[in-house]
Amino acid sequence: MKCSVVKLLLTVIIPCSSLAQLQYPNTKKTDTIDNYHGTKVPDPYRWLEDDNSEETKAWVIAQNKATQQYLASIPYRQQVKRRLEELWNYPRYTSPFKEGDYYYYYKNDGLQNQSILYRQKGLKGVPEVFLDPNKLSEDGTASLAGLKFSLNGKYVAYSVSQSGSDWRVGYIIDVNTNTRLSDKLDWLKFTGFSWKGDEGFYYTRYPEPQTGEHLKGKNVLPQVYYHKVETPQSEDILVFEDKEHPQRFAGVGLTEDERFLLLSTSEGTSGGEIWYRDLKDSARTEFKLLIPGFKTEPRVVDNVGDKLLVVTNDGAANYKLVLVDPASPAAAHWKVIIPEKKEVLQSVSTGGGYLFAGYLKDASTKVYQYTYEGKLVREIKVPGIGTAEGFGGKKKDKEFFYMFTSFIYPPTIFRYDIETGKSELFRKSEAKFDPSLYETKQVFFKSKDGTKVPVFLNYRKGLKLDGNNPVLLYGYGGFNIPMTPGFSVSNAFFMEQGGIYAVVNLRGGSEYGEVWHKAGMLEKKQNVFDDFTGAAEYLIEEKYTSPAKMAIRGGSNGGLLVGAAMAQRPELFKVAIPQVGVMDMLRYHKFTIGYAWSVEFGSSEKKEQFDYLYKYSPLHNLKEGVQYPATIITTADHDDRVVPAHSFKFAARLQEVYKGENPVIIRIESKAGHGAGKPVTKQIEEAADIWSFTMYNLKMPFKDQSGNTQGKEKLKGF
């Protein structure tokens, strides 16, 4: 690919048609042109990729000012925010887990920015604060990103993220005294901690980025190190790096008995190899290959003596569990423990001397308990259609705690007796939401090519099929990630206001195994967009809603989905909410970890892949003279997963080709990232802005708890 840049700068004033009062900031254009395999592609907003430039910073300030002026004019914005604060304000807990003499759990009193880690001796003991992330920053933007206790519970290693960045800093706490040691580990990313006894642990880090590049520079050459407690990071021992393949990922883990050190490598977000070291053989320090090829998705569950339990889709698109002998690891020698089923094997964990296998049946959880020999003990019954997680623990455990949730069932914690199979309610949710007033319905429709695709519909009982119901259509469709039922305070608010929250299980996810995933990746990515627009058409045909009442939403890969859908079928939707989306499909691989997505998307550096990427890339398929939906684009200044340049350039182009009365605004959050670790204050503010924008443009009045409505008047000040 060749690139030519002409430094002539042009200034464009964006017309606002009949909504002349909403003045968009001027956005400079340059004569930047790329040549992709003979096709010349203009990139006039390339300068917005430089998030450190004063021009870009000024543009961000101007755009946020215009956005906030518009949002402040929505008559009921403050009422929406107050109601969201009321709904958010209830105690939330995670399932407890035991380490040493203590049970640990996270709790948020309601409006605390970050959940606090508590501990107590016994389930009826007195709780004490163990680690409070709210004390790590004044504004709640520092978050606890992960933690792991040492073998005997003497220490805990934890990592902290600042402003939602994927970069982490690691620390260690002495559990007995609850004091932080002097250890500090920098430049951690995409890693956990794998303890060896109480002496030290393995982790992955990256080389320190160049100045000014830590939020957008390409991350390559991951390095696996061993850190000994109470020593400086500079003395850590390098365990693995691959200079010949610097774009491969690398991570390590240990089996529960600490016999095997496992190294997982991958060339992207799909496909992997597994290497191992038998630590019982101290004379051997090199890794040996266990599962080769990068063509399958292997995951080691644990070991059984000198053999390893591995979940694999090798010859089993819906996955199976096999026992692998490292001495003869070829697939022909594997022993099948849990064979492939019609449903997708989503996870296998261990606990109390048993295996727990989690399956997806039409995107809902089924859980089974097995012996290590593969004999079925029982199905673990869960309350209904929804998502259950948290099964498993240590081999010595007699019980564990799991959580069940659905779209209309707030997270509820159950206590499970491993031997008897008895589940009992441990902690009921205190959410200000009455599930008896709502219902969930799963429907199926035929996509453009005849494929049957499921949709979850969630709404208040008494729904009338008159084509006038407001709908929020949500999807993701990629990276082998399923969209499973889960409760959200934000979505509960929309249902409370009379909306239908609809979730489509698009191809590209893992709802129906690897075949479903592959049907929505690379050159078949268009299937994902067809599934999404097909769901919209189905809801319109069945009189659930109409285009004037339809909003679409998605984040990250789902932001790409929304961008592509609104570009291809703008007439279907009234509101579009692309969040932290991948919008420039020709240059995404040039930033941070984006190159890893090429196994899913393809790369513009290859002619045949450029051709289909260019056809659907949201940035490159916005056309002059089209009335696009009312659009609120969201991103954040510390998003180093999908850099904000994607959203910046998409917003600039959409405002450039703007026609009609629908607003196009971009909300750029400060001191926030791709979404993880976002403080509750920022979550509520963002939800208030998005729902106010959505409801107003769908002509939904705000309903208070007394049944009074507000919002039929025009925008204040416009």
Whereabouts are the PLM-identified features?
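Beta-propeller blade signature
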Residues: 119-120, 171-175, 218-230, 275-280, ...
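Cap/lid segment of the alpha/beta-hydrolase catalytic domain
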Residues: 134-150, 159-165, 179-182, 416-422, ...
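Non-catalytic accessory segments flanking enzyme active sites
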Residues: 54-148, 159, 248-303, 336, ...
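Bacterial Sec-dependent N-terminal signal peptides
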Residues: 1-23, 709, 713-718
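Polar, glycine-rich mid-to-C-terminal structural blocks
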Residues: 222, 226-265
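Short, conserved, GDST-rich strand-edge loop motifs in beta-rich repeat architectures
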Residues: 161-162, 205-220
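Active-site-proximal cap/loop segments of hydrolase catalytic domains
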Residues: 503-718
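Hydrophobic beta-strand positions that form the internal "hydrophobic ladder"
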Residues: 103, 153-157, 201-202, 261, ...
